[in-house]
Amino acid sequence: MTDTKRKPIWKNELVWLFLITSGLFTLLYSKFLLGGFAYVFTDCGADTLQINYAQYEMFSSLFRSGDSGYALQAGLGMDLSSYCPAYLIPYNLLLILAPQRLLPWAVLASAYLKLLTMSLVGYLFYRKLMGEGIGTMAAALAWTFSGYVILWGQQYGFCTCMALFTVFMYFLQCYLNGEKRWKNAGLVLTVTMLLFASYYFLYMIAFFAVFYVVIYSIMQKRSIKSAAGKMIGLGGMGILGTLIGGIALVPIADTFLESARAGAVSGGSTSGLFHPYKGKTLGTIFARFFSNQMLGIDKEYSGNLNYYEGIVLAVSILTVFAISYFLVKKATRIKAIFLTALMVFLVVMPFTSRVLVFTKNSHRWCFMICFVEALAIGLFLQDVFREKNKKTVLCGGALATIIYAAMMVFVYSFK
């Protein structure tokens, strides 16, 4: 089915997804919608109040006053023009257009639009891989309300990057499918917006895109020539998108070179990068696969690093059932073994964090794993209801139960 094919509104999965997403947002964010609280935090998420919200107020004031963008409040003065491109992103543009007295509501509306983007555009992406059905809707919802999005999404910029990442993946899949060329322009512009939003998220997403193109080409049994052609085209569009955002390149480069990350790239030790995590770090990985809260919240958090920086892998317990099902099913066993082994390797090796985040003491890249988990859940639900061999379903369920029990025993022995 194409994206433009019309269906009766009560049968349109996008309409139902819109309603479900809106309902879940209302439920999860009712404290801010109905309880008289602003969507800012004063605990370990205090950056939202001390940095983000303050910046939004300042840029909203500058926009409304018509000032040049040179702030005298910062030391001897500071040119803020290099920050302006970030407010061309629709989610951020809303924040400076809203009157300052309505800024708390604008922040909440922006969060809603980001989650809605992840849900609806995520659905369009997953539909290209598995068609319509309950699995596609489940995958979109699993991604939108995954542990990473809900936790790190409290940091407004992270949620913006997750929404743009979802849009990027949709246009990337359109490109790989050879669809209309205007969609390539969407891919280019999304790269530009990602550059404005966060240079290191763009960097991480570029790595994921390369992996995705390679693995997708292998799964689709495409020729090396075809895969290489797609990779070159993707690289060209990435460069074009970066050049379009050229106004932000110089300040971004300056910010990076002056940051701690630049020193980490060249000065960090490489010892132990290919030795799997052990002890507390490994226990945290297992625990946070089930829930962000399993090791406590904020100051009560007992895992590795801190509540935010500790790895976040929680999507749904259905991930275990999906993996087990595809491992048991003969037609998918080899692919499942390969992909599961690859994901586990990336998660347990410090090398991954060092390459993607420039330090082994951060796991901000794990949104990629959550995105793949949501895909696995969708494929599982899409396939399991069509599976005629009930023995496969039962064996998959039994294996999942064993794996789940073993992981829980390990987690509680660690705690």
Language model: regions and residue ranges:
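Membrane-interface coil-to-helix junctions
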Residues: 22-118, 141-163, 256-263, 269-311, ...
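Membrane-interface helix-loop-helix junctions at transmembrane boundaries of multi-pass membrane enzymes
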Residues: 222-232, 321-344
